[in-house]
Amino acid sequence: MASSMMSNAATAVAVAATSGGAQANMVAPFNGLKSIASFPVTRKSNDITSIASNGGRVQCMQVWPPVGKKKFETLSYLPPLSDAQLLAQVQYLLNKGWIPCIEFELEHPFVYRENHRSPGYQDGRYWTMWKLPMYGCTDPAQVLNEVEEAKKAYPTAFIRIIGFDNKRQVQCVSFIAYKPADSY
C-alpha cells in the first residue's frame, strides 16, 4: 500500500514537471482592465517650435546686454522717464496708499559687491535719503518739486523715488527719477 502511494505521488510529480509545473492550474496574472491597443497613440516630435507658443519668434528674443549698460531699478530697461511719466508713476503709488520717499546716490547707483563675497550680500542697496519720507503727500507735483530740489543740490547724483507701504512695512516700488548727463 505504501508502495502504491509512493508511485502515485512520484507519478503526479513527474506529470506536473512535464506539463508546466504547478502554474498549469493557476489563473493568469492581472494585466489591466482594457487592452492598450484600443487607445489612440499620438507621437510628439522634439521640435522646439512645437513646444514654444510663439513659434518662430523664439529666435529673435534678446536679453539685456551685459556690457556698457547697468541695471538700476524697476523700469531701468526703459529710456529715461519724462515729467508726465514720472507724474503718472507717482500718482500710481499715491493711489495705492504708499508713502513717497526720495533717495540719492553719488558714487555707486547700482548694486555691487565690495565688502563681502558671500552669496546674497550686496553693497549699494542703501542710498542716502533726501529729507524725510513725504507722509501725507497727495500731490505728485509736490514729489517732483522735491526731485528738482535734489537735482539742484546734487547735480551729479542719481535720484530715485520709492513707494513705501507703512502697513506692511515694505518698500513696494523703486525707480530712477533722474540720471546725470554723463551717466553710463
Curated annotation (Swiss-Prot):
Superkingdom of the source species: Eukaryota
GO biological process: one example: photorespiration
Any one of the GO CC terms: chloroplast
Pfam family, one: RuBisCO_small
Single Gene Ontology MF annotation: ribulose-bisphosphate carboxylase activity
Subcellular location: Plastid, Chloroplast
UniProtKB keywords: Calvin cycle, Carbon dioxide fixation, Chloroplast, Photorespiration, Photosynthesis, Plastid, Transit peptide
Additional remark text: The basic functional RuBisCO is composed of a large chain homodimer in a 'head-to-tail' conformation. In form I RuBisCO this homodimer is arranged in a barrel-like tetramer with the small subunits forming a tetrameric 'cap' on each end of the 'barrel'.
Entry function: RuBisCO catalyzes two reactions: the carboxylation of D-ribulose 1,5-bisphosphate, the primary event in carbon dioxide fixation, as well as the oxidative fragmentation of the pentose substrate. Both reactions occur simultaneously and in competition at the same active site. Although the small subunit is not catalytic it is essential for maximal activity.
Subunit structure: Heterohexadecamer of 8 large and 8 small subunits.
Family listed: Belongs to the RuBisCO small chain family.
Protein name: Ribulose bisphosphate carboxylase small subunit, chloroplastic 2
Organism, scientific name: Amaranthus hypochondriacus
Gene: RBCS2
